UniProtKB/Swiss-Prot annotation:
Pfam families: Urocanase (PF01175), Urocanase_C (PF17392), Urocanase_N (PF17391). The gene is hutU. Its main location: cytoplasm. GO terms for molecular function: urocanate hydratase activity. Binds 1 NAD(+) per subunit. Belongs to the urocanase family. NAD(+) binds at residues 52-53, 130, 176-178, 196, 201, 242-243, 263-267, 273-274, 322, 492. InterPro entries: Urocanase, Urocanase-like, Urocanase_C, Urocanase_central_sf, Urocanase_CS, Urocanase_N, Urocanase_Rossmann-like, Urocanase_sf. It comes from Shewanella baltica (strain OS195). The active site is at residue 410. This is Urocanate hydratase.
Amino acid sequence: MDKRHDPSRRIIAPHGTQLSCKSWLTEAPMRMLMNNLHPDVAERPEDLVVYGGIGRAARDWDCYDKIIEVLQRLEDDETLLVQSGKPVGVFRTHADAPRVLIANSNLVPHWANWEHFNELDKLGLAMYGQMTAGSWIYIGTQGIVQGTYETFVSVAKQHFDGISKGKWILTGGLGGMGGAQTLAGTMAGFSVLACEVDETRIDFRLRTRYVDKKATSLDEALAMIEEANQAGKPVSVGLLANAADVFAELVKRGVTPDVVTDQTSAHDPLNGYLPQGWTMAEAAAMRKTDEAAVIKAAKASMAVQVQAMLDLQTAGAATLDYGNNIRQMAFEMGVENAFDFPGFVPAYIRPLFCEGIGPFRWVALSGDPEDIYKTDAKVKELIPDNPHLHNWLDMARERIAFQGLPARICWVGLKDRARLALAFNEMVKNGELSAPVVIGRDHLDSGSVASPNRETESMLDGSDAVSDWPLLNALLNTASGATWVSLHHGGGVGMGFSQHSGVVIVCDGTDAAAKRVGRVLWNDPATGVMRHADAGYEIAKNCAKEQGLDLPMQD
């Protein structure tokens, strides 16, 4: 019997102000863990899988139950330690220490590969935490929508003079992360054709308003795109098909999209990518009997897809890797020029990282959408001179369906995160918000990740693989008083290719929270400015000087 599978489970986080735990500092991680497994949030909640192939919230259901039990009895001077989804210890610390410290999927570098991890996973000794799955701050597909939107806006500026009308994006994957592409693309003015082999995922994106239409043939999908472009109104289409098949077929037909990318779960060839010609049932059966065959076939199909992406790039498409390590997989299968198209961070996002700008997110623990709408208004009030941000918040309210507890994401940087958070804390204190909020972020941020094929690709000084930075980030956030801090390996791009840290803090309206919030949400983005200044980026150096950061080697 698989202790990770229980179809009888239906997890819904409590709403309102009644506590199940001894304070909001422990109620918050409990609700957010539960929210990660909400049926409208998680990809496979019955298996504890939140997103990203096998990214889990807890190692198994026994561990989940025990985590909840411990959080409900945890005192405000105690800290729970979670090792790869398993609660392993409670220790006396102090009131400003994190209530939970999490380490997920971390392996000694020589053994940091999928083969060794999968053996540990089978033995029940490890859990793949992805980024926000095992760190309990996943907010559904919204969590990556704005970052994807910002990327597509940058693509339009760089390649099409800012004009996206009448243009379309080809991509693959409509899972928890990939599902953002369709909505983000149409928000940015593009039509989007997204290939997905799992029809339930397309239907899920239709239900949550991330996809406009479903197609079952390439001809049908292309007709939908053409009709929308002729009408000047962008549309998103979920095509039930294998991305490798579709990408190669478009090359064969001589049909060139304007933009090409991919967000299949290529980072995990065993569990995340369906080989060409295979059904999902066949793949599921083969994973139990011949893992090596599945991996080989999946990587061979990735090679086909990447070759097609290169061919489409040659034909004129703006082509980018969206951080799932598909280029690496294809390179290992003999596609020697797999890295000829860039990753999205060095191509479009790094200037934002240099100012500590990244995916700031918050969640209303009350469960009341009005709390989010009030914080939206507060963001506009405190940042009045950013029409791009205001436009994002307006579009988000109009077009993004909340999944689980109401949440919002917006990309802001060093100069704004702490003051926004302090304002939210004050809103809780004076009763404007009906309950506390938690503030966190993706591990994809400016100072919290080392990932040479994604966030730290092509660093100016060649420090792509130096992973001291996320370790320092986690240590500093712990010292600063975050409510929970996490340190993971392998998120986004798979085992052996990344290390990254997460942080969440509770705004409960107290003066003590204000002090913690002020420290954490200044120091956290400041480490990103520090990291990029150290690598030699002038934008980061200037930001550090303007914000008064004490960086000894930058004097």
